[in-house]
């Protein structure tokens, strides 16, 4: 155990390229002398890249440059800075009345990571010395034909592991996201944002101030250390994983606003820098279990649930913190954000803002077939949906009703092929709608390929 701890601690330092621990007999009976040797890693890292983009058929190009110092303070601290830029030509922008067809985005992100927990409370514990503290901040400048946005972010995070890495902890001590929308095309505002049924869409194009604190705990039955990693991969047996996350937003700003008697706007909400801050609570829980049925087969199960609720200074959850269903890791008979909430009927091909919810339920089962080569195969069944906790005008039939819960659960079946390249697993899944809660019909009895079949390309297992 001490050998694994030493090897893992040294290998986890960014300034160390390789580490080796050997033993020689000591003069004292029953004792050994540990000889530790390390080789330093290259301290600097520079990467430049350029790539093409395709967003809903709009072609563009993006480029970035990243610089990283792996030992900036001579104690394996990592400083990283990334500069990025993107251009995209929006099809039909001029015909739609936009002044330009160009989309520009510039970004700068920087982070500083320390190989220990910087806290006076836990600083002397083994977990703290093996943990990590990360400070990061970023800015995004975005101009589109229909609007302009600016994002400013800051994050202060602790990460550590215990029980031979079986238990992992992440404390996001304070995360701030400040979003400004300085300009919106009047025609875009009138046609889309001012429509009463587009309340969620409008929320995404308003100034926002989100502060949050979260804690995530995860458990893995496999003890993964540097010396046992390959053994775990090659001789994988039945395993289980469990995690939960608690996310609280807006508590500190609301406390300060209440103490210092900040002024409220017309909606009775406190503001910071003239922007109402979000306030909500969110809880997620997730469990998965894999059973080895033999050398070439395994059966995997997954269940997940989540609930989020606004309170005090907010009436709705911010869009980026809401739940969605469908996609390569969800109910695979639907594409991402095409399912729910509840019995909600999709309006058009771009209704993803309204297809989100405050409650999520998901259950999945997958029978996997492993071969001697690099290919794997699977058949699967998924069930789940998202709901709102209250009836919103723009999301009719989206509210969760316990008596109707079973009828609101969507179901899909499918099959997939996976390419296991050891360092990465490439997955191609084909899902088919089995039961659609929006129509209350079993599509599986008379499937239509275009309507009911969805193709998913992803990296890694779905769970």
Describe the function of each predicted region.
Residues 1, 45, 94, 99-304:
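Transmembrane beta-strand segments of outer-membrane beta-barrel domains in Gram-negative
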Residues 1-54, 281, 306:
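Periplasmic polypeptide-binding modules associated with outer-membrane biogenesis and secretion
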Residues 14, 27-29, 56-60, 74, ...:
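Transmembrane beta-barrel outer-membrane domains
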Residues 22, 44-54, 63-65, 69, ...:
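Transmembrane beta-strand segments that form the barrel wall of outer-membrane beta-barrel proteins
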Residues 32, 298-380, 388-390:
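Extracytoplasmic gating/loop element in the C-terminal half of outer-membrane beta-barrel translocons
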Residues 40-42, 71-73, 116-118, 160-162, ...:
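Outer-membrane beta-barrel strand-turn architecture
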Residues 91-95, 149, 166-168, 254-260, ...:
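Outer-membrane beta-barrel and related beta-rich outer-membrane complex signature
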Residues 419-423, 450-463:
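Outer-membrane beta-barrel "beta-signal"
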């Amino acid at each position: 155990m001490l050998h694994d701890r030493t090897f893992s601690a040294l290998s986890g330092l960014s300034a160390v390229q390789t580490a080796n621990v050997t033993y020689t007999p000591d003069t004292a009976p029953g004792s050994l002398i540990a000889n530790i040797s390390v080789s330093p890693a290259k301290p600097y890292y520079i990467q430049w890249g350029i790539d093409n983009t395709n967003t809903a058929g709009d072609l563009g190009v993006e480029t970035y440059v990243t610089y990283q110092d792996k030992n900036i303070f001579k104690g394996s601290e990592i400083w990283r800075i990334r500069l990025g830029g993107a251009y995209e030509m929006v099809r039909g922008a001029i015909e739609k009345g936009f002044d330009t067809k160009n989309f520009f985005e510039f970004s700068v992100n920087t982070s500083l990571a320390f190989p220990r927990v910087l806290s006076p409370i836990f600083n002397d514990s083994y977990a703290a010395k093996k943990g990590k503290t990360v400070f990061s901040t970023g800015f995004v400048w975005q101009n589109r034909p229909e609007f302009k946005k600016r994002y400013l972010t800051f994050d202060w995070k602790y990460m550590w592991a215990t029980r031979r890495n079986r238990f992992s902890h992440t404390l996001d001590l304070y995360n701030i996201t400040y979003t400004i929308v300085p300009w919106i095309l009047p025609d875009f505002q009138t046609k889309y944002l001012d429509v009463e049924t587009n309340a969620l869409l409008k929320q995404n194009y308003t100034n926002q101030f989100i502060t949050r604190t979260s804690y995530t705990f995860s458990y893995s039955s496999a003890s993964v250390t540097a010396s046992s990693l390959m053994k775990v991969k090659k001789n994988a047996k039945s395993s289980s994983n469990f995690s939960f996350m608690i996310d609280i937003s807006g508590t500190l700003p609301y406390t300060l606003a209440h103490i210092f008697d900040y002024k409220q706007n017309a909606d009775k909400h406190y503001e910071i820098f003239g922007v109402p801050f979000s306030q909500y609570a969110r809880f997620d829980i997730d469990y998965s279990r894999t059973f080895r049925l033999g050398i070439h087969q395994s059966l995997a199960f997954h269940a997940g649930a989540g609930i989020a609720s606004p309170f005090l200074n907010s009436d709705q959850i911010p869009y980026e913190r809401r739940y969605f269903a469908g996609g390569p890791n969800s109910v695979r008979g639907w594409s991402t954000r095409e399912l729910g909430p509840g019995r909600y009927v999709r309006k058009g091909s771009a209704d993803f803002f309204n297809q989100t919810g405050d409650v999520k339920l998901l259950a999945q089962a997958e029978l996997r077939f492993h071969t001697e080569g690099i290919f794997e195969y699977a058949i699967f069944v998924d069930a789940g949906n998202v709901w709102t906790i209250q009836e919103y005008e723009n999301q009719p039939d989206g509210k969760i009703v316990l008596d109707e819960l079973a009828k609101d659960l969507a179901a899909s079946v499918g099959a997939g092929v996976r390419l296991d390249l050891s360092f990465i697993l490439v997955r191609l899944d084909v899902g088919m709608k089995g039961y659609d809660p929006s129509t209350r019909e079993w599509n599986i009895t008379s499937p239509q390929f275009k309507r009911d079949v969805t193709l998913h390309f992803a990296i890694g297992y779905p769970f």
